[in-house]
C-alpha cells in the first residue's frame, strides 16, 4: 500500500502559526511569495510533512486558486518521491497521486473559505 505524506492547507497566517506550533517546527515565514507556498518538515516519527499556504485567497477567482493548489500538489508529490528515493514513478502513478493531493487541497480550501469568490 502506498501512503501519501501528511499535508494540510492554511488560508490565514494564524492557521499557519497554529499548525507549525502543533508540528513543533521552528518558526518560519508564512507569506507565500507568489500566492501560494509549501513548507516542508519532518514529523516526530520521521515522515515528510507539508503545510501549504495560500495568501489572500478571497481575492482569487476559482480557476486561479485551483491552479495554485495543483501547482503546490505537484511540489508535494515531487518532494515525497525524492524523500522515498523514487526517481522514476510511472506516469499513471504521478497522475493519480497529484490528482488525489490536488483534490484534497481543493476540498480543504472550500471547507475553510466557502469557496473562492
Over which residues does each language-model region extend?
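Generic recognition of cysteine residues
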Residues: 10, 50-53, 81
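Non-catalytic terminal regions of proteins
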Residues: 1-35
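Acidic-and-aromatic substrate-binding clefts and catalytic sites of carbohydrate-active enzymes
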Residues: 59-60, 85, 95
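Active-site scaffold of zinc-dependent metalloenzymes
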Residues: 23-63, 76
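Short, conserved micro-motifs enriched in small and acidic residues
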Residues: 63-64, 68, 89-93
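Post-HExxH zinc-binding segment in Zn-dependent metallohydrolases
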Residues: 88-117
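Short helix/strand-bridging catalytic loops that position acidic/His residues to coordinate divalent metals
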Residues: 80-88
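Active-site recognition of the HExxH zinc-binding catalytic motif
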Residues: 67-79
